Amino acid sequence: MAPEVMCKQNHGVSVDYYAVGVIAYECMMGRRPYNGKGRREIRDLILARQIKIDYNEIPQGWSTSAVDFINGLIKRKPAQRLGANGPSEIKLHPWFRDFDWDALESYKMDSPFKPPTDDENFDKKNSESEWKDINEESLQHCIELL
């Protein structure tokens, strides 16, 4: 959780960039950026010090631009965080140098992973017509409850 959320300060989309940075850190390093025995201890660690990946601890297969990207996302101060000045900061980062943003935005990019379509473990009774039979009045009532 981003420090500004923990401190109950006003926040914006940069808290999501922080979250992506934490996830990317975990993917790269194979561990959490902050380790504590409980939520309070983890919160105190996040608020006490800035974590970063040192260039001398880059795992094999990862680049320095990936480290720079992750370190930019996990900045404690939102104004210093990568993406604080808009999504173009993310899109223009060197780690995405060869990424085709236009193909992504126009849905022309193939997924790098396609899960099997085997529905053997899927209970079909949960998807069959139960929502098709709902009348307009019931649907409106559901919408009002939301």
Predicted regions located by residue number:
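Short proline-rich PxxP-based motifs
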Residues: 48-59
